[in-house]
């Protein structure tokens, strides 16, 4: 009986000790904490690679959500044949794409602003800013798609 209790306590301790970031997955990279993710690298080179990796995952996730948003728009207009709806779907899709392009330019500009001036931490400042902006946009897209 004592062994079972000790075993259960050990298992519970392991569960509680797992970092929260493990709850994230590549299919939902926005759940990763960029600081924890980047710090998996042992040196600046590895940290930069981790930053690029997370940025790539976040970009792919954002692109996927934008495609879903466009599909949602198409489904919303499906079967609407009245004259007042002619051309409206195309306008909406152009607006979605334009918003996304503008948003991407903003995220890039904000990250470049953090990078300005250089220094040893400039690259990491760029990626911190960029990844946090991507996470912000992903959360926004997820709310819209609910």
Which role does the model predict for each range below?
Residues 10-21:
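Bacterial N-terminal signal peptides
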Residues 23-146:
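N-terminal alpha-helical modules
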Residues 1-12:
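Bacterial N-terminal signal peptides that target proteins for export
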């Amino acid at each position: 009986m004592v062994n079972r209790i000790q075993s259960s306590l050990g298992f519970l301790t392991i569960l509680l000790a797992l970092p929260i970031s493990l709850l994230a997955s590549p299919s939902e990279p926005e759940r990763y904490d960029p600081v924890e993710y980047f710090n998996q690298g042992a040196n600046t080179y590895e940290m930069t690679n981790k930053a690029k990796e997370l940025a790539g995952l976040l970009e792919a996730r954002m692109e996927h959500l934008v495609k879903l948003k466009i599909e949602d728009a198409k489904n919303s207009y499906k079967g609407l044949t009245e004259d007042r709806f002619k051309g409206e779907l195309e306008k909406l899709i152009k607006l979605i794409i334009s918003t996304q392009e503008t948003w991407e330019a903003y995220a890039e500009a904000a990250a470049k602003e953090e990078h300005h001036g250089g220094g040893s931490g400039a690259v990491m400042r760029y990626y911190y800013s960029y990844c946090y902006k991507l996470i912000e946009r992903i959360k926004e897209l997820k709310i819209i798609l609910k």
